[in-house]
């Protein structure tokens, strides 16, 4: 299954690049692949694609991407053979409360509250919750984020603590906290 998933992953990433290039003239932001799930066996595999943009993705955009991918699958005999005659294709955005899986997702969540598990230089594991105030993940050799932790003291007063800079390679998981 890994060979199938790897080949589909490469094909879908290339297709996303073509899709983004074609749509960039109309001002639509680039779409990127967050995750790919391949389930089932021939002749009816199920291909689930999680897609995102730096500013979020709409249901309409997911439907457009699904049509684009379906056409790309149909035009490529190798891919048709991998997914089978009766394949299912679903394109959606990552769900609320799911861990961040792609570095560019941090861009979309700048300003939001995150809960992050990470390791320090001595490999000790820590957890911090704070507002995402800085994101440097594109075109850099050392991608990082900066969180501004908040401590709620008695009387519900929020006390701001020193910002925490976290290198992406030290982050074990990051989840966007739902705020009401």
UniProtKB/Swiss-Prot annotation:
Q: Which UniProt keywords apply?
A: Cytoplasm, Ribosome biogenesis
Q: What does this protein do?
A: Required for maturation of 30S ribosomal subunits.
> Is Cytoplasm one of the keywords UniProt gives this record?
yes
The GO annotation for biological process reads: ribosomal small subunit assembly; translation
Name of the featured protein: Ribosome maturation factor RimP
GO cellular component terms attached to this protein's record: cytosol
In its UniProt entry, the species of origin is given as: Chlorobium phaeobacteroides (strain BS1)
State the family named in the UniProt similarity comment for this chain: Belongs to the RimP family.
Q: Which InterPro entries match?
A: Ribosome_maturation_RimP, RimP_C, RimP_N, RimP_N_sf
Q: Where in the cell is it found?
A: Cytoplasm
Q: Which Pfam family, an example, fits this chain?
A: RimP_N
